[in-house]
Amino acid sequence: MKSKVSKFYEVKIQYQEMQEDGKEKRVTEQYVVEALSFTEAETRIIEEMTPYISGEFDVVSEKIAPFNEIFLSNNYSDDKWFVSKVAFITIDEKTEKEKKQTFRYLVQAATSELALDYTKEMLSHGMSVYCIDAVQDTPTLDVFLHEV
């Protein structure tokens, strides 16, 4: 497992896909793109998807992703994307009350159970007290990162 901290965008594209019965169907797919701006995210998704889609496609939605860190797996069978919602717990020194600050992480895994295990593994290196509130499947099909 490795971690990538950056700015990410969720980008949805639409295109006509030929079905097995010969009919065309309008398909919407979601991807995550590492980019510095909406313009760069749109340019990157067009560059990445053009070789795989015959015909035209449209970028129909772009939004800043609700996470800024991705946990990437080295395992080839981990082909799905999950969002782990994690609450970090601290004590407010003035009021002496417990405070929770929630963060979301995009996790590459084969199952939600494995995504939970990966999240625990990646967070185990820190000293913070945390609670994993949820691990949810996402419609994200792939993630496009900057090449180093």
Feature roles, as predicted:
Residues 17-34, 51-54, 97-105, 125-132:
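A cross-kingdom feature marking solvent-exposed beta-strand/loop segments within repeated
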Residues 37-53, 111-126:
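A short, charged, amphipathic alpha-helix used as a generic interaction element across diverse proteins
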Residues 2-26, 76-100:
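Short aromatic-glycine-(Arg/Gly/Cys) micro-motifs in beta-strand/loop hairpins
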